[in-house]
């Protein structure tokens, strides 16, 4: 006796003998028949698709003999084979010890009354009805319509009433005795809400819903203090352990590799042979190795083509004052170049102190800027000397250290330059006189 192989929905119609109740220690209970959900559709090789005495006759013909039944379950929507031994010696009434009624599967699934809110101290609460998980599926009388249940409650006012109740949480049926009482102190005779219709039917479940996996011992068989079979191994909690930064593989999932900003995202994830791949430790648990993040690429600077190209000139490094730029030997600052630069260049030279400490010398061919730093002051002796005329000396700022040195240098060289100009003028005068005499 027991359960057999499950199959799809039965052929030959959607009717059968519906089990309303199964008594304790009866042949039906020993065979594993489930009240309300099971329909007997075949006995032996006879399909029970009509309401007649075929089931009763075949049970009497096989008293104390095993007989095979095909049973359709509305909860799993499957057909299974059951072996039962009809008997008169089990101590109860009937050969099976179960009450049956011929009806269709669809109609039986609709005859469900869902227990909703249960008020405290109400007749429903005293009877042990559980809100939202209990379903009334039958009683001592046949219930065929939605109003039949409410009529049954009214007819049993102040009298005990037996109800067959299914609980979706425990996946089992039980018998509940309730005594309707309209004077209990609240609304209704039961003190609970009742739902009926499509939204209040018992949800279907897969065939393996209430079956435990093989090899799992019952809770009582586990030793004291032992973790359950599906418990996680001991280790750091997700809050205490750092997140994995590698593209490691474990069973059937892949963890993405974190990329630094600007790095290529087309790099393949590390394979099983890479250092970051998870490898099992001696205990059989995966071990993850962390890979540090790659630094971001250097920042690229783009020069504007409109600026001066100083690629051929070594500029001063503030961190190293011993290196000083060497100007090309062909570059010379003359009095003529400075005098022809105009007042704008002189103004920019005099206002260099106000622009962050830059001193700028402007000429007709180039323009060089020097930063105001200790290294620049230490190499002031190597700067080219400028000679300015008397009319331009007043424009220099005495507060600028470089301008003061230039003014002193100009004061020392001014007599020599003046004598040179006078000598040149006399020479030109003699040449012109010689030319005039020759012409005459």
Swiss-Prot record:
Any single biological process term in GO: protein N-linked glycosylation
Q: Which GO terms describe its molecular function?
A: metal ion binding
Amino acid composition bias (Polar residues), ranges on this chain = 337-351
Q: One cellular component GO annotation, for this chain's record? A: endoplasmic reticulum-Golgi intermediate compartment membrane
Q: Where is this region: Disordered?
A: 205-248, 261-301, 327-440
Q: Which family does it belong to?
A: Belongs to the GORASP family.
Protein name per its UniProtKB record? Golgi reassembly-stacking protein 1
Q: Which organism is it from?
A: Homo sapiens
Q: What is the lineage of its organism?
A: Eukaryota, Metazoa, Chordata, Craniata, Vertebrata
The gene name on file is GORASP1
């Amino acid at each position: 006796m027991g359960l057999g192989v499950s199959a799809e929905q039965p052929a030959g119609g959607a009717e059968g003998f519906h089990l309303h109740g199964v008594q304790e220690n009866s042949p039906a209970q020993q065979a594993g028949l489930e009240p309300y959900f099971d329909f007997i559709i075949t006995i032996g090789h006879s399909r029970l698709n009509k309401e007649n005495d075929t089931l009763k006759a075949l049970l009497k013909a096989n008293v104390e003999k095993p007989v095979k039944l095909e049973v359709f379950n509305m909860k799993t929507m499957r057909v299974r084979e059951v072996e039962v031994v009809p008997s008169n010696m089990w101590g109860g009434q009937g050969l099976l010890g179960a009450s049956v009624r011929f009806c269709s599967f669809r109609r039986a699934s609709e005859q469900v009354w869902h227990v909703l809110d249960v008020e405290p101290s109400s007749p429903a609460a005293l009877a042990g009805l559980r809100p939202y998980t209990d379903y009334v599926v039958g009683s001592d009388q046949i219930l065929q319509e939605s109003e039949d249940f409410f009529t049954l409650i009214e007819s049993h006012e102040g009298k005990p009433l037996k109800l067959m109740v299914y609980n979706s949480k425990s996946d089992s049926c039980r018998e509940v005795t309730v005594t309707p009482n309209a004077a209990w102190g609240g609304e209704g005779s039961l003190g609970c809400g009742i739902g009926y219709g499509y939204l209040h039917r018992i949800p279907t479940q897969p065939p393996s819903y209430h079956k435990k996996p093989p090899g799992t011992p019952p809770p009582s068989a586990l030793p004291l203090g032992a973790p359950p079979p599906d418990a996680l191994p001991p280790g750091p909690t997700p809050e205490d352990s750092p997140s994995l930064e590698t593209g490691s593989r474990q069973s059937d999932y892949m963890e993405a590799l974190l990329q630094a900003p600007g790095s290529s995202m087309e790099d393949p994830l590390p394979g099983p042979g890479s250092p970051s791949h998870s490898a099992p430790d001696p205990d059989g648990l995966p071990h993850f190795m962390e890979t540090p993040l790659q630094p971001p690429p250097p920042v690229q600077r783009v020069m504007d083509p409109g600026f001066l190209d100083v690629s051929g000139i070594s500029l001063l490094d503030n961190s190293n004052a011993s290196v000083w730029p060497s100007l090309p030997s062909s570059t010379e600052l003359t009095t003529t170049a400075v005098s022809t630069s105009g007042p704008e260049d002189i103004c920019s030279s005099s206002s260099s102190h106000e622009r962050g400490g830059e001193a700028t010398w402007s000429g007709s061919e180039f323009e060089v800027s020097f930063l105001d730093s200790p290294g620049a002051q230490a190499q002031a002796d190597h700067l080219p000397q400028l000679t300015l005329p008397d009319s331009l000396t007043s424009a220099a700022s005495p507060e600028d250290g470089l301008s003061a040195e230039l003014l002193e240098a100009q004061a020392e060289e001014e007599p020599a330059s003046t004598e040179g100009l006078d000598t040149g003028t006399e020479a030109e005068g003699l040449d012109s006189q010689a030319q005039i005499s020759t012409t005459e």
